[in-house]
């Protein structure tokens, strides 16, 4: 908003995308309308930005720029990953990151508990649970997540964040 008022050019990455069930869309589209240059991740998103009234000459389909980061970072070997986690990791396992659906009718705790019940249907699988994001309902999920991991220490690891390389691994 300040950049718009002060006439500071803004370049927006990933405009035109849709996140169903989240208020991210309203924020993303507002940023699109305040931006001067638009770098979208795919042609349908480029078309959506143009449909929002932005000049086609200012909208570029450049792909998902974060994917380039994947090419520059090799995954960790499994033993190094396990050592960095302090968790004896073996296959099969699930890596689970749950973010609340911000516009859902159901409260996040109910949805999260249902997901944990589904994970219990796979007792031979280990589970790495990362904390939710900062969206509404995320904080309420953390104690549930920690209790779940605490009650299954040989099978479940709860961790606030893996960071990029461990998540990739």
Question: Which residue stretches match the model-derived regions?
Answer:
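A nucleotide-sugar donor-handling region in carbohydrate enzymes
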Residues: 35-110
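Short secondary-structure transition/capping segments
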Residues: 22-26, 72-73, 140-141
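Donor-nucleotide binding loops and adjacent catalytic segments primarily
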Residues: 76-169
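Cofactor-binding loop segments of dinucleotide-utilizing enzymes, especially the Rossmann-like FAD-
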Residues: 15, 43, 64, 132-134, ...
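Short acidic loop-to-helix transition motifs that present clustered carboxylates
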Residues: 18-20, 45, 66, 162-166
């Amino acid at each position: 908003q300040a950049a718009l008022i002060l006439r500071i050019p803004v370049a927006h990455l990933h405009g035109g995308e849709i996140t169903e069930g989240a208020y991210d869309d309203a924020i993303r589209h507002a940023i699109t309308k305040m931006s001067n240059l638009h770098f979208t991740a795919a042609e349908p998103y480029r078309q959506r930005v143009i449909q929002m009234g932005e000049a086609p000459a200012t909208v570029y389909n450049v792909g998902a720029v974060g994917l380039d980061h994947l090419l520059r970072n090799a995954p960790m070997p499994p033993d190094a990953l396990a050592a960095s986690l302090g968790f004896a990791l073996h296959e099969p396992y699930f890596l689970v990151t749950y973010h609340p659906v911000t516009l859902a009718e159901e409260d996040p705790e109910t949805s999260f508990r249902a997901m944990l019940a589904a994970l219990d249907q796979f007792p031979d699988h280990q589970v790495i649970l990362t904390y939710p994001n900062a969206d509404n309902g995320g904080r309420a999920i953390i104690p549930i997540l920690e209790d779940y991991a605490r009650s299954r220490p040989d099978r479940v690891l709860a961790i606030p964040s893996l960071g990029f390389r461990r998540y990739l691994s």
